[in-house]
Amino acid sequence: MSLCEGVVSLSALAGAAGLAIGSIDFGANVNGRLPFGSPVFGAVALAAVVGLPMAIACVADWRGARRANQLTMGAGGLLVGWIVVEVVVIRSFSWLQPAMAVIGAAVGFAGYRQWSLTWGATHDEVAGPMPGDEIRVPEAFSATRAVSIAAPPEEVWPWLCQVGVGRAGFYSYDSLDNGGVPSSREILTGFQQVAVGDLAAPMTFPPSPNTSFIVASFEFERALVWAKADGVWAWSLVPDGDGTRLVVRLRTGPDWHHAARSLIGGVLVEVGDFPMMRTMLLGIKERAENLDTQRSTSLQDARQAV
């Protein structure tokens, strides 16, 4: 991707230089529709809107900078926007514009996809091992995301144990993944026991092996791994000072024994997994932090009463 960004950046900067020195001339009609009616201002705009953002994204991508994906998204969007301005406002047309629009859209989407697959996670968390990595699945999709929670692991763990339809929900978009039933804001004591082989995170009620994961392994208050034939959903709770670093990794791919269902599922994962998983992580964060605050307040009240 950095190579593509570099080529686009150099092309845009070369075009800007050509406009500025007069070696590129669109004619009086088009020049009059450039910013301030001046090719020089047009050159400045082209360099500022396309050339420099693409160059910055290229360098950030090449160096593996933390915000490289966001910069790539922005640069791709600006390129598409520039092409729209050329066609609609400046009314300058060339065969390169469709190609540049496609490149801009592809660059922007690539940045978005990589950002969404690693949302909140550090480079070490993305590259490092996770519980459940040893389980082999047909892997076509892999996402590692994370969130910092101002509550200890023992106050985050219960919210994971009770995930699923007919239980606490998924703390996400309840109309989509929980039949419209609001996800619980309380710890449900009836769903706190975890054992290898149990059905986990059921997506229907009553739970069914076809619509649930199975608990593949767990380490109490530290790790929880759910698995099924075509995927692994793993959670890691890492102590982080007084809080928790909650890391989640989803690996999934086609189950050719159910090809049609896998195809539909693959499309849904690509489109819907990120917004729902992000909301789920933030939902767990909110609930665990609220519980921690309530317990701290109750403890302070009890101490004051004594």
Across the structure, where does each feature detected by a protein language model lie?
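Alpha-helix-centered segments that form part of catalytic cores
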Residues: Q192-V215
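Beta-strand/loop substructures that line and gate deep hydrophobic ligand-binding cavities in soluble
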Residues: V126, A227-E286
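Hydrophobic ligand-binding cavity/cleft-lining segments
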Residues: M1-L10, W115-L199, G283, E289-N290, ...
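Intrinsic-disorder/low-complexity, polar/charged segments enriched in Ser/Thr/Lys/Arg/Asp/Glu/Gln
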Residues: A140-S148, A223, V232, G243-R245
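Short beta-strand segments that buttress and anchor functional surface loops
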Residues: A200-M203, A223-D230
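Hydrophobic pocket/interface hotspot
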Residues: L13, V156-W159, V215, L246-V248, ...
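A short, structured loop/turn motif at beta-sheet edges
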Residues: R63-G64, A150-E154, S217-E221, L237-R245, ...
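Topology signature of small-to-medium multi-pass alpha-helical membrane proteins
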Residues: M1-D124
